[in-house]
Amino acid sequence: MTSSERHRLSLIIATLGPSTDNEKELITMLMAGIARQWTDGVDIARVLHSDGEDVAKKRIEIFREQSKKRNLSTSIYLDTDGSDMDKYIAFGNEISPSIMSFDISNGLDFFKMVKSKLGDNIKTCVRVKHGTSTDNLDDFFKECDYSMIELDSKIIHDDKIVTRSKDNMCEPIYLALMPTLMKGQVQSREENFEIGHTLEEGFDLIALYQETSHGPYAARS
């Protein structure tokens, strides 16, 4: 895939939150394509179980309902900042997301067994947070379908994170940080450069967290 093809096909995973609880804002995001792969119109929404089960379930229901009304093929990416994995897994099996993310701090043995506790159609993702050692990442990549990479761009490049993930049949996702979008509608030149440079590493999926869940211009993000 060439660089131009990669950017054209990139998916954006947008986090739902208070900003998108405004249904008009959510609809605007859907119609703009919060994660549009131009070849087949896929949209992906990240929902946090740790925001509360009732809240998460309502966000998922509304997202799916609005997507169905517009004949959009959508996906749910379920994540959590919580520590109760049993409750999280039970919720995941109930709502059946396309992807479920688990923090790397759960340990390798956890990742080796978690798929057996999930529905057959749920893909697993290892969440690699800022500051995580990259030494043993390959072992985790081997057990997962996706990896959420929240590392600095220099580490991503120097430690060949994208190549290592893909070599283990684990699709890497890049967390794009654009703090200026928490205040305005346009990201900074530095943020654009950082994201563009990192995408050249070979990411085909990009995630937005606070920018869409809590930012004043969620759809614009």
Placement of each model-derived feature along the sequence:
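Non-catalytic helical/linker scaffolds that mediate oligomerization, partner binding
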Residues: 1-221
